[in-house]
Regions:
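Catalytic cores of the polymerase beta-like nucleotidyltransferase superfamily
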Residues: 1-221
Length: 221
């Protein structure tokens, strides 16, 4: 059985979107990202990542969430506003530049995050990147290269290891090495900027930032 088959992804997306959105809202919202790992490990999601096609769609989603009892627990512009609904964390991105599900999927860096369900006036539809199927079949965490969000590659590496731990998968050595080679290929000011960005978005910021700083020192020596 293919856990990431379109019908399974659609049923999963609908089961969660139905909790706070009508079947055919005026705007369009995309439930994209790591929540679909639940189809592989069988546990409920800890959080949902919502992206909207435009500002009006985002406003509609927030109004609908609050009408269902959601409350804001963190606001971190220009990245996301985080709401809590019945113990579930829901992150609503500020970025609305990707106006289609295809564009949103193309903006991800990890294959198992390149899965999404769109809800809009025309109903629901899903999209699963082909490499997500490969990742699941191999039980490996794979990158979508070249990385679109390469400036946040260190955080992507952290997420890769978190995904692997949650799923019992592995991070192939060549995938991890790709990130470090990308990091080392940058000029020194950009390498330090990548470290600063990582520390801003990471809740851990331990071994990865330490290795990054060590590599910077080695290159400078």
């Amino acid at each position: 059985m293919n856990s990431l088959a379109p019908n399974a992804v659609l049923q999963f997306g609908q089961s969660w979107l139905d909790r706070f959105l009508p079947p055919r809202p005026q705007g369009r919202v995309f439930l994209v990202g790591g929540a679909y790992k639940c189809l592989l490990h069988g546990r409920p999601p800890r959080d949902l990542d919502l992206f909207c096609a435009d500002v009006n769609s985002r406003r509609e989603v927030l109004v609908s969430l609050r009408s269902h009892g959601a409350r804001t627990i963190a606001d971190n512009p220009p990245y996301q506003e985080t709401l809590s609904l019945d113990g579930l964390s829901i992150e609503v991105a500020y970025d609305t530049t990707q106006s289609t599900l295809e564009a949103r999927i193309d903006s991800t860096d990890i294959a198992l995050s390149a899965i999404g369900c769109e809800r809009g006036p025309a109903g629901d539809r899903v999209l699963v990147h082909p490499l997500a199927h490969v990742s699941a079949a191999r039980r490996e965490i794979l990158l979508l290269t070249p990385l679109v969000n390469w400036k946040y590659a260190l955080y992507t590496l952290e997420r890769m290891h978190r995904y692997a731990e949650e799923l019992g998968f592995v991070v192939p050595a060549e995938q991890e090495e790709y990130v470090w080679q990308l990091f080392l290929a940058q000029p020194a000011p950009e390498r330090w900027s990548m470290i600063r960005r990582y520390k801003l978005v990471s809740a851990q910021s331990g071994p990865i930032s330490e290795r990054a700083m060590s590599l910077c020192a080695e290159v400078s020596a």
